[in-house]
Each structure stands twice: as C-alpha cells, then as structure tokens.
Amino acid sequence: MKTVTVKDLVIGTGAPKIIVSLMAKDIASVKSEALAYREADFDILEWRVDHYADLSNVESVMAAAKILRETMPEKPLLFTFRSAKEGGEQAISTEAYIALNRAAIDSGLVDMIDLELFTGDDQVKETVAYAHAHDVKVVMSNHDFHKTPEAEEIIARLRKMQSFDADIPKIALMPQSTSDVLTLLAATLEMQEQYADRPIITMSMAKTGVISRLAGEVFGSAATFGAVKKASAPGQISVNDLRTVLTILHQA
C-alpha cells in the first residue's frame, strides 16, 4: 500500500496521525486560535472554513489561510468546507463549493483539500484532477451524523473514493449501538486488507465510537481527529490524551 507524504509527514505508516480542526469566525479569531494551536501536539491542521463568516469574500478567506500558513509553516494544512448536509455550519451551492476549493488550490497556501464524495461525480473527478495538477492532496469524505450503514455500503463508498483517485478516502459515521461501532471497524479492516491501495481514515462518532478513534493502527485507519479546545465532532478527545493512547498502542 502506498503512503501519502505531505510536507515531512508520512501518512499511512506507523501510529495514526492526529488531525485537529480550527474553527474561527473571522480574521482576528483565526489569528488568536492559530497562536493557541501552535503550542499543541498534533500532525495536521484542518481549517474548517464553513465556520468562517465572510465566505463570500475570497480575498478574506485566503488572507485567513495565509495567517494559518505563516503561523504554522511546518504543519500540513487541510482546507475543509463541511457542507450543512454533512454536518457543517453553512449551506452553499455546489458551484460555490467547487469555486471555493479551486480558489484554495490556486492560492498555493494549502497542502490538502477535503472534497465530499456526494458533491456530484463529474465535479469531484474534475476537482481531484485540478488539485493534483497543483500538487494538492485530496481527502475525499463522507459523513453521516444519524446512522451507520451496513459494512458493504461503507466499503463501497470508500472504494468509490479510491476509484475517483482520492489520496485519502475518509468516512465518519454515527453509531446507534455498540454493534454499529463493530460494523465500522470490520468494514475498515476488510477495506484495508482487501481493497485499499492507499491510506484511509474511518471513525465511529460520539462516546460510543471513541474506541474507533484510538484503534486505527489495529484496524487500518491512518489518522484520527483530536480536540485542542472545542471538539469539531462528537466523541473527539484531547490531543494530549490521544497521543498518549496512540503511542501506547503503537509501542505495545
């Protein structure tokens, strides 16, 4: 299986990498949050752009991205607009979503973009090609904050992302029971052992699914999300606790 290298970080080998999400409404809070995050122990900075108020002003968005890049130049920067339909803060049209991601790619400020699988097949394929032409990696994602589908469906979605040439397929699902967590873990393992030729990220959300955020190295998830301050999704634990547990499991 091939790994994915972003800056000096190799994703897909060793302990799962820690991603943290920065959620800020304006330039001033981007700046203050960035300074606070700089002291934390994590591997990838995700900027959740859907929390940013001045979205229609592309110059303002890119000015904020520049602050993040300059404050943490060594950290891979993942640009993510999470749509309202997948649990994000704002709803925008598909055209605006694609344009925003293309602007991020064009800026040269971001290392990775998050691209939602169910944006539309043609738009997804074109945006992946555009990102790769500009040396930007793509995390292709799907989120369900209500339920966990059958393992076959989870695997089918991850394989579709892989077929669309995502660098890293990602799926996050809400469990309604502990057995749903086992379904997610079993699907992750089957994907990793039988189909994946690149790193994948999977997680079961909420308190019920916390084990999935810790056991990635066992079942085949290459990264996990932790919280510096406020969790960006239910079930995230603090980066310090997360690093401790990931290290224990890695060294066991």
From Swiss-Prot:
Reaction catalyzed: 3-dehydroquinate = 3-dehydroshikimate + H2O
A Pfam entry, by short name: DHquinase_I
This protein's pathway: Metabolic intermediate biosynthesis; chorismate biosynthesis; chorismate from D-erythrose 4-phosphate and phosphoenolpyruvate: step 3/7
Activity regulation: Inhibited by sodium borohydride.
Cellular component terms (Gene Ontology): cytosol
Domain of life according to the entry: Bacteria
GO MF annotation list: 3-dehydroquinate dehydratase activity; protein homodimerization activity
EC number: 4.2.1.10
Membrane-traversing stretches: none
GO biological process, one term: amino acid biosynthetic process
Chain residues that bind 3-dehydroquinate: S21, E46, W47, R48, R82, R213, S232, Q236
Active-site residues, as the UniProt record annotates them: H143 (proton donor/acceptor), K170 (schiff-base intermediate with substrate)
Keywords annotated in UniProt: Amino-acid biosynthesis, Aromatic amino acid biosynthesis, Lyase, Schiff base
Family according to the record: Belongs to the type-I 3-dehydroquinase family.
Task performed by this protein: Involved in the third step of the chorismate pathway, which leads to the biosynthesis of aromatic amino acids (AroAA). Catalyzes the cis-dehydration of 3-dehydroquinate (DHQ) and introduces the first double bond of the aromatic ring to yield 3-dehydroshikimate. The reaction involves the formation of an imine intermediate between the keto group of 3-dehydroquinate and the epsilon-amino group of a Lys-170 at the active site.
Oligomer and partners: Homodimer.
Identification of the protein by name: 3-dehydroquinate dehydratase
Organism listed in the record: Escherichia coli (strain K12)
UniProt gene name: aroD
